UniProtKB/Swiss-Prot annotation:
It comes from Komagataella phaffii (strain GS115 / ATCC 20864). The keyword Nucleus applies. It holds the Pfam family RRP36. Associates with 90S and pre-40S pre-ribosomal particles. Residues 27-149, 253-272 are annotated as: Disordered. Residues 162-224 form a coiled coil. The gene is RRP36. Residues 63-75 have a biased composition (Basic residues). This is rRNA biogenesis protein RRP36. Residues 99-117, 253-269 have a biased composition (Basic and acidic residues). Belongs to the RRP36 family.
Length: 289
């Protein structure tokens, strides 16, 4: 085999051919670029914006179609088990809200995990991590409001049983005299002509309110004493007969009517009559409807 001989002239000719080919390719590219730029110059801005909007709508529709495509159950379970970080979405976009399907899936999962509501008769539960207090709260022993206060009165403590109201009334009956004295003194202050000049309207109203509260307190205590006395007398006469609350109410009303003055009795009867008429009118209106 003879080795091929290349002359200097043949090599130069090849280089010239190669350079001419390159020049032609570059010239063609420049021509095509000029034509493209000329076409873009002729297109209006409105048509460009329309084309852009159309492309965006097409992209959205394609994304929706991709979402609507049902995946097999195995893939679904794998996706549910694997949760991507909160900053990156399924499409790889940053800081986007999760899709509605993902939210519905998570809400269903949470609803399944939620425990059922316990019965009110179930035993009370407490955390094992929380330390048990040395002073235990026993229901019925501690007062609701008095337990947190600084000072406690032993006489009214529930730990020593229920308070005997009759015994307390007998022990503190002397307070009625003080109450009546206070009412008379306050009435004198109001009747005085100098009170309007010396006292403000607010102070006068507070005195009136105090008189009213003291009077109502005295009246309630007197009514309670009367009820207890009537029940005591009835039990003394009828030992083997149990007194019902309705019978007790009737006996108390009768005793009150007997102790009333005729003018007071008329007022009470008139008030009851008006109340009864109001009830009847309400009943008529209800029946008409």
């Amino acid at each position: 085999m003879k080795a091929q001989k290349f002359s200097k002239a043949s090599l130069l000719d090849d280089e010239d051919d190669y350079s001419t080919q390159l020049d032609r390719i570059l010239a063609r590219r420049k021509k095509s670029q000029k034509e493209d730029s000329g076409d873009l110059d002729t297109i209006s801005f409105g048509s460009l914006s329309k084309a852009q909007a159309r492309l965006q709508t097409e992209e959205r529709e394609s994304k929706k179609k991709v979402k609507k495509v049902k995946k097999p159950k195995v893939l679904k379970k794998q996706e549910e088990d694997f949760q991507p970080p909160s900053d990156i979405s399924d499409d790889g976009e940053f800081f986007e809200e999760p899709s509605q399907d993902h939210q519905s899936r998570t809400s269903d999962r949470h609803s399944k995990e939620e425990p059922r509501s316990k019965s009110k008769h179930a035993p009370s539960e407490s955390s094992a991590k929380k330390r048990v207090s040395k002073v235990r709260e026993i229901p019925g022993l501690l007062n609701g409001s008095g337990s947190s206060s600084l000072y406690q009165d032993v006489r009214f403590d529930t730990a020593f049983g229920k308070a005997d109201l009759q015994k307390a009334r007998e022990n503190y009956k002397f307070l009625d005299e003080y109450r009546e004295k206070e009412i008379t003194e306050l009435n004198k202050i109001l009747q005085d002509d100098m009170t309007e000049q010396l006292l403000s309207e607010r102070e006068i109203n507070t005195i009136k309110y105090k008189i009213q509260s003291l009077k109502s307190r005295v009246d309630t205590l007197k009514n309670r004493d009367l009820e207890n006395e009537i029940v005591r007398d009835y039990k003394r006469n009828h030992k083997n007969f149990f007194l019902k609350n309705s019978d007790k109410r009737k006996l108390v009303q009768k005793a009150k009517f007997d102790s009333m003055k005729p003018s007071q009795r008329e007022k009470v009867i008139e008030r009851k009559r008006k109340r009864q008429l109001g009830r009847e009118f309400k009943q008529l209106e209800f029946n008409q409807k």
